Amino acid sequence: MAGHSQFKNIMHRKGKQDSVRSKMFSKLAREITVAAKTGMPDPNMNARLRLAIQNAKAQSMPKDNIERAIKKASGADSENYDEVRYEGYGPGGVAVVVEALTDNRNRTASNVRSIFTKAGGALGETGSVSFSFDRVGEITYKAEVGDADKVMEAAIEAGADDVESSEDGHTIICGFEAMNEVSKALEGVLGEAESVKAIWKPQNTVPVDEEKAQSLMKLIDNLEDDDDVQNVYSNFEVSEEILAKLSA
């Protein structure tokens, strides 16, 4: 499992999600607004909006917040957000891809560059690291939907490419273009997914020691703390021994 997924699991176990709930809702709302603005405000006619709402519901975002975010898209004074991707290197030469939705490119670029620099990394040009990642669909389910065999069978039938199952749940990988079709097929067997989204999946991972892992996790944490940053992906790998120490 790539470093960022491991990091998410650590943060979940430490209960950090509760302290960043408001910021998470803000990011989910921004994605809903952008999705509604770039397509139809009806989720039945707009796949991106449908998935944005589904992901928000999976995080227990209140219905009123979701409806307000959709309505905001049609407001005359609603902000125009640009989708921007930043790429760079963290400690140890680890590749990092950052996705943002911003109403001020200069502000966001300056903030992201500063975070990389303070972590001992460097912000690069667009395309400087994304070539070592694949754009794929990621569909996640909670562990209670079934055992690994059941989920694997459903995933193969739906046309997915890979499945990772653990005590934390099931992660299903599929082609980016097939994400909507695969998620609908899985929903018919396993029910509604916890999340469905496009991600940058590393083609290969870089093993890091405990010191580097801590530095990289701090880098990711600081990037995700920025209001404009929506997602962060990286290609580092942490051993089970180090993971256990960081999870303690």
From Swiss-Prot:
Family the entry assigns: Belongs to the TACO1 family.
Disulfide bonds: none
Keywords: Cytoplasm, DNA-binding, Transcription, Transcription regulation
Chief site of localization: cytoplasm
Species for this entry: Agrobacterium fabrum (strain C58 / ATCC 33970)
One Pfam family, short name: Transcrip_reg
Region (Disordered): 1-21
MF terms (GO), sorted A to Z: DNA binding
One GO location term (cellular component): cytosol
Top-level taxon: Bacteria
GO process annotations (BP): regulation of DNA-templated transcription
NCBIfam families hit by this protein: PRK00110.1, PRK12378.1, YebC/PmpR family DNA-binding transcriptional regulator
Name of the protein in its database record: Probable transcriptional regulatory protein Atu3727
Signal peptide: none
Subcellular location: Cytoplasm
InterPro entries from the UniProt entry: Integrase-like_N, TACO1_YebC-like_2nd/3rd_dom, TACO1_YebC_N, Transcrip_reg_TACO1-like, Transcrip_reg_TACO1-like_dom3, YebC-like
